[in-house]
Curated annotation (Swiss-Prot):
Gene designation: PHO85
Example of a GO MF term: protein serine kinase activity
Pfam family name, one: Pkinase
Name of protein: Negative regulator of the PHO system
Chain sites annotated for binding ATP: V13, G14, N15, G16, T17, Y18, A19, T20, V21, K36
Similarity section: Belongs to the protein kinase superfamily. CMGC Ser/Thr protein kinase family. CDC2/CDKX subfamily.
Segments traversing the membrane: none
Function summary: When phosphate concentrations are high it phosphorylates the PHO4 transcription factor thus establishing repression.
Length: 304
């Protein structure tokens, strides 16, 4: 543990789901850091599981994961010291959209960001860690164009909150249909669904499934991807929140949907990858490793 006095707190840079984030300066090294302050319940203190999970994060060292340098534990707060990143994917896309109604990113950039996202996710899954809350706000970007997963492990350490003490609304837009229908079998496939939603959003410049509650979220998903049935998703009807009165929908043409929202001509490979990430049945979704070996990433795989 380092002394809090080693860091100088600079301007506030945001409210996260769990914490307030400040830009900070390591007075010893002169390096900028992000100081994430988690207020602790004075009666309950810090859950030991949270400390354990956060300690695990310190061991996650990968180019596409934001480094957690240290944890400072004082009586009423926990300060997590992260590497400082200049931007996040949501702000990056919003800035590109200024003056435009909706405009996706250039496909070369989409591919570069998606490759980095999947690299980070694959590394975490290999280490048996789920993110559970992947969304553009949690994908941090530095001025060299490196994309890194942020808030890794925090969703597990503190639970995904239903309501938060910050102005940020916990979004359902990237949440997998199995989770929305009450599945308790959280596994790596929930992060893969989120990766698919993020890929579509980078292409279109707007969220693929912008629902405002669980029910509407599922409706939007099934309207586009088709209504699940036992043949394509065994035991879907056993899920706690499965609705037997769901109107049957056939899957829509995903390529057409994306193409209508982008000026670039999409190749079939990116659409095929998206189908692999957005399988309704979690067991049918690609793994992060398989996704990285997809033909859409051929140029990256040949370069390595």
């Amino acid at each position: 543990m380092v002394a809090p006095s080693q860091f100088k707190q600079l301007e506030k840079v945001g409210n996260g789901t769990y914490a307030t984030v400040y830009k900070g300066l390591n007075k010893t090294t002169g390096v900028y850091v992000a100081l994430k302050e988690v207020k602790l319940d004075s009666e309950e203190g810090t859950p030991s599981t949270a400390i354990r999970e956060i300690s695990l994060m310190k061991e996650l060292k990968h180019d596409n994961i934001v480094r957690l340098f240290d944890v400072i534990h004082t009586e009423n707060k926990l300060t997590l010291v992260f590497e400082f990143m200049d931007n996040d994917l949501k702000k990056f896309m919003d800035n590109r959209n200024k003056g435009n109604s909706h405009k996706g990113l250039e496909m070369d950039l989409v591919k570069y960001f998606q490759w980095q996202l999947l690299q980070g996710v694959a590394f975490c899954h290999e280490n048996r860690i789920l993110h559970r809350d992947l969304k553009p706000q949690n994908l941090l970007i530095n001025n060299r164009g490196q994309l890194k997963l942020g808030d890794f492990g925090l969703a597990r350490a503190f639970g995904i909150p239903v309501n938060t003490f910050s102005s940020e609304v916990v979004t359902l837009w990237y949440r997998a249909p199995d989770v929305l229908m009450g599945s308790r079998n959280y596994c790596t496939s929930i992060d893969i669904w989120s990766c698919g939603c993020i890929l579509a959003e980078m292409i279109m410049g707007k969220p693929l499934f912008p629902g405002s509650n669980d029910e509407e979220q599922l409706k939007l998903i099934f309207d586009t991807m088709g209504t699940p049935v036992e043949q394509t998703w065994p035991q879907v009807t056993q899920l706690a929140k499965y609705n037997p009165l769901l109107p049957p929908h056939m899957p829509r043409d995903l390529k057409q949907l994306l193409q209508n929202n982008t000026e670039e001509v999409l190749d079939d490979n990116v659409v095929d990858l998206l189908h692999g990430l957005l399988q309704l049945n979690p067991d049918a979704r690609l793994s992060a490793k398989d996704a990285l070996n997809h033909p859409w990433f051929a140029e990256y795989n040949h370069a390595n």
